[in-house]
């Protein structure tokens, strides 16, 4: 082979190799940006994700009965989480649920005139509350992490004490229930919209070893710790409104959770009043 032909072949090989390397690099960059980029705040989530895709991650903090903070872990173990990319470690909780939220037995049921109908009704309410206060909250909340605030779609949990206003009955119990179910655990989140507080309104699914995949909003309705969302703004159900209303009806007819009360003010009514 002549020297000129040899040089031409080498140049062609180098060109082909360069094209392959460039293509592979661009493919890796595209794959990483599209599938492995971590979203650290609500506004990081691309519009293409909403209503179509699910995000995987860990619950690092639960501050209320219908919202929590979500640490996004795209790709899970295959995305390097736990061996290449650090996952926030939770701190074990030594306090009981009652100490975390205060003793609900001494709380007023409402901050307006409401008279219980006999001791039996009050006793039933306290009994209903106690089953939730006994739930185990295994971890403490982790704060100051790059997390997305998540608002559960389709439901409204009783309000806890905020800005000097008293808590609604079962507000603390809803918080404890939610902490027991998801704090420190992995969940799947389907973004639906962004609310006025810059929270991601989402449908949330978690794994239960005894019942498979669970819809978190639906489970709260079943246990009588939330009502179907009444607001007209940022109303999201992900095509499950009828199902949510059906299980709310069942919980109400069976007097589960907050429905044990003879007179009940919904979270929406409470927020309008205060």
UniProtKB/Swiss-Prot annotation:
Give the induction note. By DNA-damaging agent methyl methanesulphonate (MMS) (at protein level).
EC? Answer: 3.1.-.-
Which InterPro entries does this entry report, sorted A to Z? SNase_OB-fold_sf, Staphylococal_nuclease_OB-fold
**Pfam families noted in UniProt:** SNase
Binding positions (Ca(2+)): 156
Q: Which residues form the signal peptide?
A: none
Instruction: State the similarity comment.
Output: Belongs to the LCL3 family.
Q: What else is known?
A: Present with 704 molecules/cell in log phase SD medium.
* Record-given protein name: Probable endonuclease LCL3
According to the entry, what is the taxonomic lineage of the organism? Eukaryota, Fungi, Dikarya, Ascomycota, Saccharomycotina
